[in-house]
């Protein structure tokens, strides 16, 4: 639906004379303006979207440059090279051409936890567009993105791969957006790190020395177990620090095996981390938080780690959405009921085996899913057979701060290693294994093969 531009402009001017009108109304007008511009762009591109260049080549457009997006691009380019298909172009659209190593965002010096992608993209002939995709028009085979100059641009695709990742939910409890820190993106993790580094300049108090972690899942446990040593280093060994994990379930690590739960409990006990179980948070404030039980905890640092959802672009395909907004996909990772759109990584709800297990929102699954998605999206243009995505092996490697780590194998999470031995495995995974390969053609071709050995 489009709106007359003069009417929208008049409404904006009218608002300047009526300051008492709600800000929400002005936001609605911005949305109308965006929709109007978008509809104009679609009409303009309806006849000309397939330009002279695209008539000569077929374009695979990948939205996102995380673990799944990177490997999708490299794998698609790999198959095109193997088939000598010079008419296939692989294009990645993302805000920045770097892999941001999200599994390490609980660590210090977070802004260094990135790896450039242009070397590997250039080695494989992958094109990169700096932009943030805001709309998908599947019937017209168009994506709309905001470029680095804040212009709206349309891009035609022959095949589209959604690899846009996931985001933390900030609407679950009052006060999250205003008062809580998080590790969701590198920028927000950097804000938390800056805040922690600044605590030493504040007078010693119970609130200053107390950190509350909301959510006792993987991310919550890793940041909580990291904090005691970090706080002592920042505030002084003699300062009494307190780290609390708020968990809504009645036991530690509800979704983990009993064996893994026992290790987590031992580690957090040894680190003197407190758990508050069966707890619901009513509100996060500038001075801490209040539980639904009425208990208040004074803290200058509340970290939110609970609740993740797939990128909002999945809302375009509402009929295909499953748990956490992820898209139901076939074994090829093609979105159900979509002829030329694939999904991978956090946005895809994909079966890993025939036993009822599904890929988690983790780099472990995103990396291999990306390789399969890339192969299959290229195969769909080359009239090659699909490779059905399977990932029967599953491991868990949970960092437990200065205590060490724990490493498990299988969906039943049998503990195989703990403490320092597990820590070495964790470091090898997060500091080496998950990073992009060296920008060497033969090496990339080998590692981008979805059937190459992986975890």
Q: Language-model segments: what does each one mean?
A:
Residues 350-392, 397:
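A conserved FAD-binding loop/helix module that cradles the flavin
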Residues 21, 28-37:
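N-terminal amphipathic/hydrophobic targeting modules at extreme N-termini
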Residues 178-205, 296-368:
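FAD-site-proximal beta/loop scaffold in flavoenzymes
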Residues 89, 128-140, 229-331, 337:
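A Rossmann-like FAD-binding core segment of flavoenzymes
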Residues 42, 50-58, 126-210, 303:
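FAD-binding core/adjacent interface of flavoenzyme oxidoreductases
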Residues 53-130, 222-255, 303:
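Beta1-alpha1 glycine-rich phosphate/pyrophosphate-binding loop at the start
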Residues 402-455:
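C-terminal auxiliary extensions adjacent to catalytic cores
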Residues 194-240:
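Rossmann-like NAD(P)H-binding beta-loop-alpha module
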């Amino acid at each position: 639906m489009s709106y007359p531009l003069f009417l929208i402009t008049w409404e904006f001017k009218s608002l300047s004379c009526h300051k008492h009108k709600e800000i929400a109304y002005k936001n609605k007008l911005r949305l109308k303006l965006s929709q109007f511009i978008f509809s104009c762009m679609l009409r303009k591109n309806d006849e000309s979207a397939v330009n002279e260049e695209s008539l000569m080549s077929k374009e695979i457009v990948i939205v996102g440059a995380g673990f799944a997006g990177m490997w999708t691009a490299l794998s698609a380019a790999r198959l095109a090279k193997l088939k000598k298909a010079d008419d296939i172009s692989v294009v990645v659209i993302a805000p920045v051409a770097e892999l941001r190593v999200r599994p390490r965002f609980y660590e210090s010096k977070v802004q260094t936890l990135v790896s450039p992608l242009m070397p590997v993209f250039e080695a494989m002939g992958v094109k990169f567009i700096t932009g943030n995709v805001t709309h998908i028009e599947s019937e017209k085979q168009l994506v709309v993105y905001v470029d680095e100059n804040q212009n709206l641009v349309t891009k035609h695709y022959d095949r589209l791969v959604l690899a846009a990742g996931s985001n933390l939910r900030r609407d679950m409890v009052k006060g999250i957006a205003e008062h809580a820190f998080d590790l969701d993106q590198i920028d927000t993790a950097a804000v938390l790190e800056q805040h922690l580094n600044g605590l030493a300049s504040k007078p010693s108090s119970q609130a200053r020395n107390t950190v509350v972690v909301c959510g006792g899942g993987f991310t919550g446990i890793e940041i909580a177990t990291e904090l005691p040593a970090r706080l002592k280093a920042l505030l002084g060994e003699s300062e009494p620090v307190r780290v609390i994990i708020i968990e809504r379930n009645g036991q530690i690590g509800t979704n983990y095996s009993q064996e893994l739960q026992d290790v987590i409990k031992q580690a957090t006990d040894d680190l003197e981390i407190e758990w508050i179980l069966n707890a619901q948070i009513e509100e996060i404030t500038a001075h801490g938080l209040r539980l639904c039980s009425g208990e208040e905890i004074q803290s200058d640092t509340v970290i939110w780690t609970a609740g993740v959802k797939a990128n909002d672009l999945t809302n375009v395909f509402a009929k295909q959405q499953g748990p956490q907004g992820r898209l139901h996909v076939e074994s090829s990772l093609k979105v159900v009921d979509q002829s030329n759109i694939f999904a991978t990584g956090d946005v895809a709800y994909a079966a890993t085996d025939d036993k009822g297990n599904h890929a988690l929102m983790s780099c472990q699954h995103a990396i291999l899913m990306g390789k399969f998605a890339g192969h299959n999206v290229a195969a769909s243009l080359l009239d090659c057979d699909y490779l059905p995505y399977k990932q029967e092996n599953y491991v868990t490697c949970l960092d437990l701060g200065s205590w060490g780590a724990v490493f498990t194998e299988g969906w039943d999470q049998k503990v195989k290693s703990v403490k320092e031995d597990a820590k070495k495995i964790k470091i090898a995974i997060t500091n080496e294994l998950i990073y992009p390969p060296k920008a060497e053609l033969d090496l990339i071709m080998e590692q981008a093969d979805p059937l190459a050995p992986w975890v």
